[in-house]
A protein has these predicted regions:
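Tandem repeat scaffolds
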Residues: 15-220
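Cleavable N-terminal signal peptides
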Residues: 4-5, 15
C-alpha cells in the first residue's frame, strides 16, 4: 500500500528537471523560468534549455556549444560574444535580443523568430536559418559564410558592411532589405525580383546577370 501511495504522489507531483541546479555544463533547464537573470560568463556547453524562458536575461560571454535551445524564449536577452557552435535553436524566439559579437557555427535556427534582434559583428558560419522571421535584424559588420536564409523573412534587415559568402537567399523575402555598399557577388540564389524589393546603391556589387534596379537608392 505504501508503494502504491508513493507512486501516486510522484505522478501527481512531477519534478521539474534541474530548474534549481547551479549553472554548469551539461545541465538540464528545460521548461524552466529564468527571466531577468545575470548569467554572464557561464559554461552551458551541452546543456538543455528546451521550452525554457530566458527573456531579459544577460548571457554575455557564455559558452552554449552543443546546447539545445529548442523553442527557448530569448526575448530581449543579451548574448554578446557568446558561442553557439553546434547549438540547436530551432523555433527559438529572440525579439530584440542582442547577439553582438557572438559566434554561431553549424547552428540550427530553422523556423526561429528574431524580429529586431542585433547580430552586429557576429561570426555566423554553416548555419541553417531557413523559414524564419528576421524582420529588421541588424547584421552590420557581421561575417556570414554558408548561411541559409531560404524562405525566410528578411524585410528591412540591415547588411551594412556585412561580408556575405555562400549565403543562400532562395525564396527569401527582401522587402527594403538594406544591402548598400555590400558585395553580393558570392551569394547564392539571389533573384532580380529580390533585388528590386531591396535597398542598395551604386556601390552594391551584384552577381553576374543581375542589374541595379531603378528604385535604388531607396528614399527611406
Amino acid at each position: 500500500m505504501t508503494v502504491v501511495c508513493l507512486l501516486l504522489w510522484a505522478a501527481s507531483n512531477p519534478v521539474v528537471a534541474g530548474c534549481f541546479d547551479k549553472r554548469e555544463a551539461g545541465m538540464d533547464w528545460s521548461g524552466c523560468q529564468k527571466t531577468n537573470k545575470m548569467l554572464d560568463e557561464s559554461n552551458f556547453s551541452g546543456s538543455r534549455f528546451d521550452d525554457a524562458n530566458l527573456a531579459l536575461s544577460s548571457l554575455d560571454d557564455s559558452n552554449f556549444k552543443g546546447a539545445s535551445l529548442v523553442k527557448t524564449d530569448l526575448t530581449r536577452a543579451t548574448a554578446r560574444r557568446s558561442r553557439f557552435e553546434g547549438a540547436d535553436l530551432t523555433k527559438s524566439v529572440g525579439y530584440r535580443a542582442v547577439f553582438d559579437g557572438a559566434i554561431l557555427e553549424k547552428t540550427n535556427l530553422v523556423k526561429s523568430e528574431y524580429f529586431r534582434a542585433s547580430f552586429r559583428d557576429a561570426r555566423i558560419t554553416d548555419t541553417d536559418w531557413s523559414r524564419s522571421e528576421l524582420g529588421r535584424v541588424d547584421f552590420s559588420a557581421a561575417q556570414l559564410n554558408g548561411v541559409s536564409f531560404q524562405y525566410s523573412n528578411l524585410s528591412r534587415v540591415i547588411f551594412s558592411e556585412t561580408k556575405l559568402e555562400n549565403v543562400d537567399f532562395e525564396g527569401a523575402y527582401t522587402y527594403l532589405t538594406h544591402v548598400e555598399k555590400v558585395d553580393l557577388r558570392a551569394v547564392k540564389n539571389l533573384s532580380q525580383l529580390q533585388l528590386n524589393l531591396s535597398c542598395g546603391d551604386l556601390q552594391t556589387r551584384l552577381p553576374k546577370g543581375l542589374w541595379i534596379p531603378d528604385t535604388w537608392p531607396c528614399e527611406e
